[in-house]
């Protein structure tokens, strides 16, 4: 009998709402169903790393996978990267903009590869991180709620995600040294004006307008230093979206970290709930009718929240971008509004909440598409 090929799925750091562990175990289950011998290896940097890695050295694996990995920076006492002592291609599944992972993606490994959630971000890594050998854009899968969902036909929109006060982030930008401060403020203006403009494209345009050039390695370093731009854009548009709904007297239920910092123009239409671990988020989505997505940091890609809604028969109301317009049918599988014309959000939300047959039709279409393409 032929021996099964081996795969290790790591979880080397906990990402928000304990999602790294959840993703690792979902991926492992999916690989096992395909006939692989799969191990899940969860640890953090406080663990005995010798005990974690020594048993793996010299062994052959079809795939080594991690999420926003810390392993790429780990070395033995003689300077040898631990991943170079394991025989197999390593893929780092990057779950936010690669600019946050400058050191990890620059690691001098024999077989470093990357998976991304956004096509423009994949192209960015191809150009600016030559040590990454193979790249792939692939959305995360989604999971159906364990208990199943009984829809509550309430007049509210559910949003699940994190928030920070954009003014506080902008203050951080204002305190930055030059030329970073000027670059970041101009980039913020550009991305507010054009929400589907990739940050790296905007930075190249900005440099050209200033008559300046940067070599590729310095360009990536500057991008890493300008991380507050991406953080600001996320929260600027999340605030704008919730403000728009509340102004239109459409109730919003906010579940996640940081929403106590949100100041509403009409608190009567805002409900805040404590965050839940990632695995329980599907239960809340399964009992909701309409799920809001605001993810301008993946403006040529797809946030997993979209597929979570589709998997749990919850109508997804998402900011549009070219990638989503290509892979999903607007008005049939999801509903797309424009961040540039935020009034389209409240118009669409009001239509969905007043037309339950349309909601059900979209939910059923979306669930069929999820089962066909977006399971783990």
Segments the model singles out, each with a brief description of its role:
Residues 1-87, 223-228, 232-236, 247, ...:
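N-terminal pre-catalytic "stem/leader" segment of glycosyltransferase-like enzymes
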Residues 3, 11-19, 23, 133-299, ...:
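Nucleotide-sugar donor-binding catalytic core of glycosyltransferases
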Residues 8-11, 15-18, 22-34, 39-43, ...:
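Catalytic binding pocket for nucleotide-activated donors in carbohydrate/polymer assembly enzymes
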Residues 10-14, 42-45, 62-70, 89, 93-96, 290, 315, ...:
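Structural motif
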Residues 61, 87, 109-112, 132, ...:
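Short, well-ordered alpha-helix to beta-strand connector turns
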Residues 82-97, 113-117, 140, 158:
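Active-site proximal beta-strand in glycosyltransferases
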Residues 84-85, 102-117, 127-130:
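A conserved, positively charged/aromatic
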């Amino acid at each position: 009998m032929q021996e099964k090929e081996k795969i290790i799925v790591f979880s080397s750091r906990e990402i928000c709402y304990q999602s790294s562990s959840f993703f690792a175990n979902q991926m492992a289950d999916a690989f096992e169903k395909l006939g692989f011998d799969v191990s899940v290896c969860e640890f953090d940097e406080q663990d005995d790393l010798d005990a974690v890695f020594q048993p793996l050295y010299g062994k052959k694996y079809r795939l080594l996978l991690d999420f926003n990995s810390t392993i790429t920076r780990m070395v033995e006492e003689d300077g040898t990267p631990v991943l170079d002592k394991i025989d197999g291609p390593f893929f780092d599944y990057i779950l936010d903009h690669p600019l946050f992972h400058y050191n990890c993606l620059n690691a001098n490994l024999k077989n470093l590869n990357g998976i991304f959630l956004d096509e423009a971000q994949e192209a960015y890594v191809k150009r600016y991180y030559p040590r990454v050998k193979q790249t792939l854009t692939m959305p995360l899968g989604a999971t159906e709620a364990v208990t199943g969902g009984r829809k509550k036909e309430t007049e509210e929109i559910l949003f699940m995600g994190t928030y920070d006060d954009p003014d506080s982030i902008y203050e951080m930008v204002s305190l930055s040294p030059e030329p970073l401060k000027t670059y970041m403020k101009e980039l913020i203006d550009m991305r507010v004006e054009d929400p589907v403009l990739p940050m790296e494209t905007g930075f190249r345009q900005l440099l050209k307008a200033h008559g300046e050039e940067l070599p590729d390695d310095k360009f990536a370093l500057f991008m890493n230093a300008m991380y507050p731009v991406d953080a600001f854009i996320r929260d600027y548009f999340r605030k704008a979206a919730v403000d728009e709904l509340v102004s239109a007297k459409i109730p919003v239920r906010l579940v996640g970290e940081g929403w106590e910092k949100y100041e509403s123009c009409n608190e009567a239409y805002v409900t805040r709930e404590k965050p839940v671990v990632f695995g329980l988020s599907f239960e809340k989505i399964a009992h909701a009718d309409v799920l809001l997505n605001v993810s301008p940091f993946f403006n040529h890609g797809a946030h997993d929240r979209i597929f979570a809604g589709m998997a749990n028969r919850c109508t997804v109301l998402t900011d549009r971008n070219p990638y989503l317009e290509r892979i999903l049918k607007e008005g049939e599988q999801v509903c797309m509004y424009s961040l540039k014309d935020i009034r389209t959000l409240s118009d669409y939300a009001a239509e969905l909440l007043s037309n339950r047959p349309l909601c059900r039709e979209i939910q059923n279409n979306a669930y069929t598409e999820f089962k066909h393409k977006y399971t783990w």
